[in-house]
Amino acid sequence: MSKPAGSTSRILDIPCKVCGDRSSGKHYGVYACDGCSGFFKRSIRRNRTYVCKSGNQGGCPVDKTHRNQCRACRLKKCLEVNMNKDAVQHERGPRTSTIRKQVALYFRGHKEESSGAPHFPATALPAPAFFTAVSQLEPHGLELAAVAGTPERQALVGLAQPTPKYPHEVNGTPMYLYEVATESVCESAARLLFMSIKWAKSVPAFSTLSLQDQLMLLEDAWRELFVLGIAQWAIPVDANTLLAVSGMNGDNTDSQKLNKIISEIQALQEVVARFRQLRLDATEFACLKCIVTFKAVPTHSGSELRSFRNAAAIAALQDEAQLTLNSYIHTRYPTQPCRFGKLLLLLPALRSISPSTIEEVFFKKTIGNVPITRLLSDMYKSSDI
């Protein structure tokens, strides 16, 4: 659905008629957030019938905090505020991934129009000076907003456009800012990958290195950045969902390969759960991203061992990132003296899932057999990112 005329800031000031969160425009006849409009669309398109958890149809609270707790009451509220069932396009199945088109554009150099270009809200957080630019690019939510008529590449350039802060935490616990359907997991994963590139370019210290060193660091760290992103933005990692997304099953996949992938998905679940248990804030995530990125160790490219041009500078940047994180935790969490050590001890677990498994599960449907490293290099060199 297209947004009404006017600035994004004005649209975001209009509350969702269903849950009271910030709306992203008119959906099915009423102002609604992307979470509620998506829920309504899926419910109507799939002809869902829900049962109230409390047995009191319509009695459950439907607000930003509780909107995901009772689907029956949420759907009832959607209908009460006059969301139009007839406006849901039943004849149209799940849309073809716009991310696939976006990736293709970077290889073809073309621009195309899309009615489903992604939008990433962002906001600035107080942070140490070393990470000022980084924190400004850290989004508080991964929304699936539709911006009609916007060129897809232009949408990618605008990933970090500042918007009002989203009230997304209760006692430091991240809230789910949108419901992720199975068909959207690949798109969310691709967005995390794009954001890693945008993030790397936003770090002033990173851009001072030679292009060769920048690309080598990014190619080596993308897996850890991706897993950190999953932990930060609550992308679902249950095995059934991910296997459904990838299309792999016992009928079409070698049993040894399938068992390996399931084992690594379980490892991914464990590491993500450990990060979420510690309830990291945006600055801590930014520091950890720098720590895993600035690794001055030789990397392999096939059978070739490549060395960095300025390994000393890279090592110094990692030291600075660790010192910054330690200082920040000491100030922000004075009652948790072991927090810094706990976070560092979690970092090796980020590599418990192989790059090939991430590509197979999250990206193969989106970009086919294009290697992620090739995509990273191509997009990082693009002036549009």
UniProtKB/Swiss-Prot annotation:
The record's Gene Ontology cellular component field reads:
nucleus
User: What's the chief localization of this chain?
Assistant: nucleus
Name any one GO molecular function: RNA polymerase II cis-regulatory region sequence-specific DNA binding
Q: Which UniProt keywords apply?
A: Activator, Developmental protein, DNA-binding, Metal-binding, Nucleus, Receptor, Repressor, Transcription, Transcription regulation, Zinc, Zinc-finger
Which parts of the sequence are NR C4-type zinc fingers?
16-36, 52-78
Transmembrane domains' residue ranges:
none
Tissue expression per record:
Expressed exclusively in the neuroepithelium of the embryonic brain.
Could you tell me which residues form the DNA-binding region?
16-83
Record's function text = Orphan receptor that binds DNA as a monomer to hormone response elements (HRE) containing an extended core motif half-site sequence 5'-AAGGTCA-3' in which the 5' flanking nucleotides participate in determining receptor specificity. May be required to pattern anterior brain differentiation. Involved in the regulation of retinal development.
For this chain, the family text in UniProt reads: Belongs to the nuclear hormone receptor family. NR2 subfamily.
The entry's protein name is Nuclear receptor subfamily 2 group E member 1
Gene name of the encoded protein: NR2E1
